[in-house]
Amino acid sequence: AEGEGQRDLLKAVAHILGIRDLAGINLDSSLADLGLDSLMGVEVRQTLEREHDLVLSMREVRQL
């Protein structure tokens, strides 16, 4: 179940960033490296809080 949650989280974040092909991304890249802007950051943060009970600062979100 934990693996499923991680995949769901990855898919949700990729969708927010407009990434269609998950296989094509470098998992060592931060969200900022992948093109995260401030509005996307807020959306990622809200998704993490709402769907995964993770509360992160905007700085932490950018470093993901």
Swiss-Prot record:
Enzyme Commission code: 2.3.1.85
Reactions mediated catalytically: acetyl-CoA + n malonyl-CoA + 2n NADPH + 2n H(+) = a long-chain fatty acid + (n+1) CoA + n CO2 + 2n NADP(+)
Record's subcellular location: Cytoplasm; Melanosome
Matching Gene3D superfamilies: ACP-like
Domain annotation Carrier: ranges: 1-64
Modified positions (O-(pantetheine 4'-phosphoryl)serine) in chain numbering: S38
GO biological process: fatty acid biosynthetic process
PROSITE patterns found in the cross-reference section: CARRIER, PHOSPHOPANTETHEINE
GO CC entries: cytoplasm; melanosome
Alphabetic keyword roster: Cytoplasm, Fatty acid biosynthesis, Fatty acid metabolism, Lipid biosynthesis, Lipid metabolism, Multifunctional enzyme, NAD, NADP, Phosphopantetheine, Phosphoprotein, Transferase
Domain of life: Eukaryota
Top EC class of this enzyme: transferase
GO molecular function, one term: phosphopantetheine binding
Residues recorded as bearing Phosphoserine in the entry: S38
Subunit: Homodimer which is arranged in a head to tail fashion. Interacts with CEACAM1; this interaction is insulin and phosphorylation-dependent; reduces fatty-acid synthase activity.
Function: Fatty acid synthetase catalyzes the formation of long-chain fatty acids from acetyl-CoA, malonyl-CoA and NADPH. This multifunctional protein has 7 catalytic activities as an acyl carrier protein.
The name this protein goes by in its record: Fatty acid synthase
Species the sequence originates in: Oryctolagus cuniculus (Rabbit)
Name of the gene encoding the protein in the UniProt record: FASN
